[in-house]
């Protein structure tokens, strides 16, 4: 499969600033301070442990890209927790999340292997105008189910 599949239910947020790692590490279920180019799966939980959002965090040289459920209040919650932290939160509203099972490098803006399971292919973050992605996510959902990766209910 050489095409990409659009995941319209996912959104992107860029977090930059000197305290970006400590800010995220106090809120998320996993340590996201890793090497540039590494991705990590994490979750935002309530104090009681209820799942609010599942996220993928990708470390770039000067920011962390966070992929989260588009219909969640993840970005709003992060703004609420920001207070005096030396971080900037930027919604990447003109970007899209796609997935590809082709390991051939592309001209995509950001591309990395899904850290949860190799069967889930490669995540691609790019400006929405740069892609003609397929909207049939059946192949992705089949791979997700085969890898026993749950999906959020609609």
Predicted segments, located by residue:
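Basic, glycine/lysine-rich polyanion-binding surfaces/domains
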Residues: 1-154
């Amino acid at each position: 499969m050489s095409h990409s599949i659009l995941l319209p239910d996912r959104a992107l947020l860029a977090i930059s600033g000197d305290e970006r790692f400590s800010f995220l590490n106090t809120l998320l279920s996993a340590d996201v301070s890793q090497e540039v180019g590494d991705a990590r799966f994490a979750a935002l939980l309530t104090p009681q442990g209820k799942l609010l959002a599942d996220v993928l965090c990708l470390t770039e040289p000067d920011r962390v890209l966070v992929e989260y459920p588009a219909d969640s209040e993840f970005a709003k919650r992060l703004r609420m927790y920001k207070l005096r932290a030396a971080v900037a939160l930027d919604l990447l509203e003109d970007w899209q999340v796609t997935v590809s099972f082709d390991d051939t490098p592309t001209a995509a803006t950001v591309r990395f292997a899904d850290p949860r399971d190799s069967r889930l292919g490669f995540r691609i973050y790019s400006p929405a105008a740069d892609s003609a992605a397929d909207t049939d996510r059946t192949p992705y959902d089949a791979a997700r189910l085969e890898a026993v990766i749950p999906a959020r209910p609609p």
